[in-house]
Amino acid sequence: MRSFTYQYKGETVESLWAVSVEKGDLRYKVKLGPDLWLTIVPTFVNSTGDKIIWLQSNKEHEIVQPHDLVQAMGEGIEVFLEQ
């Protein structure tokens, strides 16, 4: 089972949820609060090989990019996948 950590207000926090598989794709889930969780979908850009991490909040019901999440929440959150 894979885990990940994320940065919140300068503090490194370990994931509170495990990994789930939906439609054959990995979904990394983290719980940020009692009623707020994020689904993180790692995707790769074929042309460059760069990893793009998408975040889906159960509050917004839409997939956003990290900078969109930071703008929406007013906090800096960075997610780091650990193999």
Task: Please state what every model-predicted region is.
Residues 17, 30-32, 41-42:
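Residue-level recognition of conserved beta-strand positions in structured domain cores
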